[in-house]
Amino acid sequence: YEAIDLLKGMISRPSFSRDETAVADFLQAEWQKAGQKVFRKGNNLWIIAPDFDFGKPTLLLNSHIDTVKPASGWTKDPFTPEETEDDQLYGLGSNDAGASVVSLYEAFCILSEKEQPYNLIFLASCEEEVSGKNGIESALAELPPISFAVVGLSLIHISEPTRLLS
């Protein structure tokens, strides 16, 4: 399945905050192979749906590609994606926030297949874990005005699962 393979590709590349180039290069190449026109500023990547119309409101789908460095408690290689017996994907960034990036990208692709009453922009931002100056704020300055957004962390129950949920 392409989405799982994309997530595995993200996991297998170090993407620590302020050093996300390897994963940004990988995602840009994969999305371009899929026919997407990918825009880039630093390690921020975005795609604008082809039927963009300034007369419509704009929905931003956003999650981040950076991770924290692995803590000492890891019992397996954090950069070797592994599917567990209970269909979980193990690896650094699989949960925070690779799964969100892949899920929101897939949603963008599906929604972009037909005209919507709103514009769609998908943004995979960097430096979220450190609130870096080269992250989402620098990317937003390059985008058309955003009316509303689905952000991985804001909709935690949908796109960034944590232990806070039961």
List where the protein language model places each region.
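N-terminal helical capping/dimerization or prosegment-like subdomains
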Residues: 1-70
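Structured loop/turn residues at beta-strand edges in well-structured enzyme cores
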Residues: 5, 118, 144-146
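Generic recognition of short, well-ordered alpha-helical segments
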Residues: 22, 102, 134-135
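Active-site metal-coordination/substrate-binding segment of hydrolases
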Residues: 56-121
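Acidic, glycine-rich active-site loops and adjacent beta-strand->loop/helix elements
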Residues: 65, 123-131, 136, 154-156
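Substrate/cofactor-recognition hotspot
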Residues: 139
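A glycine-rich helix N-cap at a beta->alpha junction
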Residues: 142-155
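Single conserved hydrophobic/aromatic residue that forms the stacking wall/gate
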Residues: 156-166
